[in-house]
Amino acid sequence: MALALSACTPVAMPDLAAMMPAMRWDHRPEASDWTQATLTAVAARDDALAGKVPADIATFCPNYAKASLPERRAFWAGLLSAVAKYESSWNPAASGGGGRYLGIMQLSPRTAAQHGCDAQSAAALKDGAANLQCSVKVMAHAVGTDGVVAGNGRQGVGRDWMPLRKSKERAEIAAWTSSQSYCR
């Protein structure tokens, strides 16, 4: 609780969790930290993400072209949260491909190094927030290069994350992001 200086009366503090955009990982105890880390990383890459309108955005976020900057950032964070369902079931300690792919977004240390991520070791990539921050760098590079969210499934985010290469999973991800308040 804070005091309003002008009247010295108590003022309720806003519920920050209620102000966060919806993510598919909201059921996880780390949700608030992951969402904040992802939104911060997306804001740092507005040049390739929220500042652009990808050619196939209507499939994933129908109102994106008219959306505010915070809504656009929420879309990119929401997209990662939807892809993470398929990559790791939102498990930050997940390890796949014989230990080559790590964490919530199943990044390899090699990919992390190629993109100049702070998290490059196996241990660091198993930190959910660090993995997501790195994933934003990877995503920004791919989307910036291709000008699409997923294109034919092998472009944009689909370059690095297999769920977008599968039409059924790509459609489910798009249905989820499209239904969020920041995309309507």
Region roles according to the model:
Residues 8-58, 117-184:
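Non-catalytic cell-wall polysaccharide-engagement segments
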Residues 85-90, 110-114, 138-141, 145:
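Amphipathic alpha-helical interaction surfaces
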Residues 93-98:
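Short, solvent-exposed loop/turn and secondary-structure capping segments
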